[in-house]
Amino acid sequence: MAASSTVTLCTRLDFCYCVNSDYRDAIDANVARVRGLIAGHKAQGKAIGYLSVPLSPAGGGSFAVNAEIAAATASSVTARLGAQSAWILNPGAEGGDRMNGAGGADFMYMWTQILEGRNGAGEDFDFFYFAGPFDFASFFKLTGQGDLERLEAWFDARAAQDPSFMTAVDNGSITRAGFRNYYGLRASVAFSYGSHDDWNIARAINARRRGAADFGIANQLAIFFDGHPVTPGSYEEPTAAGDAGRCVK
């Protein structure tokens, strides 16, 4: 079997990724599918959001747990805004069933196209929501008292009840201390490769909107972090790239 090849692919706003060419058709198909999903909700008059949330286990977390947190956060944001009036795109739920084994750059090339929209102004979206420490704390029911100990207890209970989680513990892909420290000290978009790119995408979209006669400052994307609106001085600043970057030959 021939080895997979990689290729640099760039989006309308010039975000470039080193993409595994085996996933190009799957990416194109899911971009079209998710755009259709968004269009259906827009046709109902809903405000459309995007949830930026860590999904990778990088740093000590668990993909399965992160996916559960993403779903819980999406549900919480939807409840806050009203399900009849808003819909939020959860990347943990809409990654596509043909993307198994894909890497971060493959996923980000896909999400970047969806977020930018056909015109590069993020015209399908009204707001971005970046998950933060309090979103994670809410999932684990942390109280601000003995939080790391609560996370250790949560880890022990999950390992006792979930065979796949216990398997990950046994093979060393997740550890009690790593889990505790990640979710207790670093659980946030601040430590996510993909979310770093999401932030820069939101910034680029708003920069384009500010300079467009049909958008302008008044019609920028609303940006939320950890449940609160972000100030203009913050969301106009870039952050370090995550998965974005050209292939190195």
Q: Across the structure, where does each feature detected by a protein language model lie?
A:
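Conserved catalytic or regulatory cores that recognize and/or transform ribose-phosphate-containing ligands
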Residues: 2-249
